[in-house]
């Protein structure tokens, strides 16, 4: 049986790893073993952060909506509650875009939400009763 030397395959594999690790600093871009290890970590980070990015964008949208809502004298929580009660189905991404691009339309949505909200039982009453 003929002996199989893996010269071509091994060099091709090493070349592909080193090519993929081109932008890394120091030994991680030049030495195969270090480059391979860094490549594994990099792919793990990329996989993890593609999923984390979705949550980060949601946080950003909520912050933007909250800022615009408070400028209209309502909290984010009450705004979302009112929009759900009014049957307005607009997601947070589009709501944040509306808040930035078209403040007048956002104010109209706030008015719709306010009209659909039940009376706040925790709000201070104007009847003058002392607690």
UniProtKB/Swiss-Prot annotation:
<protein>
    <recommendedName>
        <fullName>Large ribosomal subunit protein bL20</fullName>
    </recommendedName>
</protein>
<dbReference type="GO" id="GO:0005840">
    <property type="term" value="C:ribosome"/>
</dbReference>
<keyword id="KW-0689">Ribosomal protein</keyword>
<keyword id="KW-0699">rRNA-binding</keyword>
<dbReference type="GO" id="GO:1990904">
    <property type="term" value="C:ribonucleoprotein complex"/>
</dbReference>
<comment type="similarity">
    <text>Belongs to the bacterial ribosomal protein bL20 family.</text>
</comment>
<dbReference type="Pfam" id="PF00453">
    <property type="entry name" value="Ribosomal_L20"/>
</dbReference>
<dbReference type="GO" id="GO:0006412">
    <property type="term" value="P:translation"/>
</dbReference>
<dbReference type="InterPro" id="IPR035566">
    <property type="entry name" value="Ribosomal_protein_bL20_C"/>
</dbReference>
<dbReference type="GO" id="GO:0003735">
    <property type="term" value="F:structural constituent of ribosome"/>
</dbReference>
<keyword id="KW-0687">Ribonucleoprotein</keyword>
<keyword id="KW-0694">RNA-binding</keyword>
<dbReference type="InterPro" id="IPR049946">
    <property type="entry name" value="RIBOSOMAL_L20_CS"/>
</dbReference>
<dbReference type="GO" id="GO:0000027">
    <property type="term" value="P:ribosomal large subunit assembly"/>
</dbReference>
<dbReference type="InterPro" id="IPR005813">
    <property type="entry name" value="Ribosomal_bL20"/>
</dbReference>
<comment type="function">
    <text>Binds directly to 23S ribosomal RNA and is necessary for the in vitro assembly process of the 50S ribosomal subunit. It is not involved in the protein synthesizing functions of that subunit.</text>
</comment>
<dbReference type="GO" id="GO:0019843">
    <property type="term" value="F:rRNA binding"/>
</dbReference>
């Amino acid at each position: 049986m003929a002996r199989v030397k893996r010269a071509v395959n091994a060099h091709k594999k090493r070349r592909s790893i080193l090519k993929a690790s081109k932008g890394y600093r120091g030994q991680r871009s030049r030495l195969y073993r270090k480059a391979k290890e860094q490549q594994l970590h990099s792919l793990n980070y990329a996989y993890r952060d593609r999923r984390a990015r979705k949550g980060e964008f949601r946080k950003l949208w909520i912050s933007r909506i909250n800022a615009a809502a408070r400028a209209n004298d309502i909290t984010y929580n009450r705004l979302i509650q009112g929009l759900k009660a009014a049957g307005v189905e607009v997601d947070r991404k589009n709501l944040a875009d509306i808040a930035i691009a078209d403040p007048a339309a956002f104010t109209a949505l706030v008015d719709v939400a306010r009209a659909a909200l039940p009376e706040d039982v925790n709000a201070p009453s104007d009847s003058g009763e002392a607690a």
